[in-house]
Amino acid sequence: GMQLNTAAAGSNYNSSSNQWMWDSNVGWLANSNYGTSTNSWMWKRGQGFDVVTYQGNSTAGHGVRHSLGAIPEMMWVKNRSSTYGWFVYHKDLNGGTNPQNYYLEVNSSSAEVDDDAIWNDTAPTSAGFTLSNSNEINSSSGYYLALLFASANDEEGNPISKVGSYSGSSSEVTVTTGFQPRFVLIKRASGIGQWTLFDTLRG
C-alpha cells in the first residue's frame, strides 16, 4: 500500500492526484481520501514486469539478478537513500545501437545521455543487469529500487504489453502495438522533450 503524508507536495487536502502503482508482489491498495479526486492504477505482477531491490557496493560491474524471465527492454532505477532521480534504460536509445551506453531521466526533459556512469556500458540479460560505480546507481550506502519491463503476451499468445519506439514526422504518425493499450508513456529520446502519458481512465 501507500501512505500520503500531510506535506503539500504529496497530499494536499483539497487537491486532485494521480497514482500509478506497480505492486508486483501483493496486488492490493488501501487508500483513504478526504474530499479529494484521486486516480489510482495498480499492476499485479505478471508477464513483462518485475521489481528488484538491491544494495549498492560502489564497484563498477556490480551485477543484479532479476526474475523478469526475459531481457529487460526498459528499466527504471531509483536510489531510495537519496534525492537522485529515476534513471532509465531503454532498448531503443541511440536508435537501438548500443543502448546500454545511454540513459534517460524520468525527472528530466533532457535528451538521452551517452555515459558509462550508469549501466557500465553493459547490456542487460535475461538473468540480470550491470551497474557502474556511481552513487546515483550503485553507492555502497544506497538502497535501490528497479522496475523492469519487457514486451509480453498472455497465456493465449495475445500481446499485453509493448516496449518500443517510433520516428516522429511533421505529420500524423500511427504506432501499431498489436493490441489496444490502456497506459502509454512517451519521451523524445533524441532531443529535449517532456514525458507524455496517456491512459484510458482520463482519455
Which ranges hold each PLM region?
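Surface-exposed molecular-recognition determinants
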Residues: 1-203
